[in-house]
């Protein structure tokens, strides 16, 4: 697949930032960030977030400007569980298809972590040599990320009750992810098996495509949702639009041990990437 076959438009806001940045300023930002990273490693203070924090202070437009260079934009992966594995799978598949992929390493799934990861990849002039970024973002930090960078693709996995100390009820987590869906410009890919995630289709803006991933019918009974466990369900009233139909999906059989593999295999990719190519790759991916 040739990356040139895919539209390379960049948003007006991001383009204007790239055009107005002086070369010396980009150099100063990268140099300062790398110095802080070196110093934090030598002193064993600050971790992966400190360089990103410093760069955010001295050059608030660095993230938008740098990711705005990508001809194929940003794929944002978020949800309660499975983010790291899914991000690795999508990045690996795109790389095998011939694209240069930038991705953030495990543990840096917050905005400053992405900035810190960029510092290791850009040239001193601020050039990022990549076609597309596949980024894992924590649910809470994803909200702040999309205020600076609108993803072209979003892959939203699930909301689960394993972080009650952070977010409270899972409806709060779903609300956080709704901001990601609302900011996505190209395609939002949602988990059909998670009702709260599937409902985010209503948040996608006009012109943004919505796609779903899910389990084969013979596997769905092994992964019940909270709603499936209820003995009685009643609806007393609906305040807004309510879906009247479900789009039929073609199940992927025999290769889906869990939802995250399904997500990686059905993510909406550039137009000339086929499911056949993705399916061939899944057989060789090493967990």
PLM-predicted stretches and their roles:
Residues 99-112:
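Short beta-strand-centered segment that lines the nucleotide-binding/catalytic pocket of NTP-utilizing
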Residues 85-102:
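A conserved segment at the C-terminal end of the G1
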Residues 115, 120-148:
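Conserved nucleotide-sensing/catalytic segment adjacent to the nucleotide-binding pocket
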Residues 82:
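Conserved glycine(s) of the Walker
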Residues 2-9, 13, 17-78, 93-97, ...:
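Short, basic phosphate-binding NTP loop
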Residues 111, 141-143, 197-198:
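Short, well-ordered alpha-helical microsegments
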Residues 156-287:
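Acidic, Mg2+-coordinating active-site environments of NTP-dependent enzymes
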Residues 151-152:
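Proline-aspartate-enriched helix->loop->beta-strand connector
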């Amino acid at each position: 697949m040739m990356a040139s076959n895919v539209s390379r438009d960049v948003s007006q806001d991001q383009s204007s930032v790239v055009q107005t940045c002086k070369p010396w300023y980009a150099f100063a930002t990268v140099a300062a960030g790398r110095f802080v990273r070196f110093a934090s490693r030598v002193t064993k203070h600050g971790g992966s977030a400190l360089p990103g924090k410093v760069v955010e202070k001295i050059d608030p437009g660095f993230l938008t400007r740098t990711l705005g260079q990508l001809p194929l934009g940003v794929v944002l992966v978020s949800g309660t569980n499975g983010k790291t594995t899914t991000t690795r799978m999508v990045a690996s598949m795109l790389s095998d298809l011939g694209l240069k992929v930038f991705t953030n390493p495990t543990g840096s799934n917050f905005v400053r972590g992405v900035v810190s990861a960029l510092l290791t990849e850009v040239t001193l002039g601020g050039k990022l040599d990549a076609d597309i970024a596949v980024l894992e973002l924590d649910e809470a930090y994803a909200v702040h990320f999309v205020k600076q960078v609108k993803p072209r693709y979003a892959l939203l996995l699930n909301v689960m009750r394993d972080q009650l100390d952070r977010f409270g009820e899972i409806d709060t987590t779903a609300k956080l992810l709704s901001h990601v869906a609302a900011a996505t410009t190209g395609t939002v890919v949602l988990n059909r098996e998670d009702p709260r995630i599937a409902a985010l289709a209503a948040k996608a803006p006009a012109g943004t495509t919505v796609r779903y991933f899910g389990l084969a019918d013979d596997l769905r009974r092994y992964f019940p949702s909270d709603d499936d466990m209820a003995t009685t369900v009643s609806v007393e009233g609906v305040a807004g639009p309510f879906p009247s139909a479900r789009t039929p999906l073609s199940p992927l059989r025999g290769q889906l041990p869990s939802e995250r593999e399904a997500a990686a295999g059905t993510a909406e990719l550039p137009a000339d990437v086929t499911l056949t190519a993705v399916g061939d790759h899944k057989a060789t991916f090493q967990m």
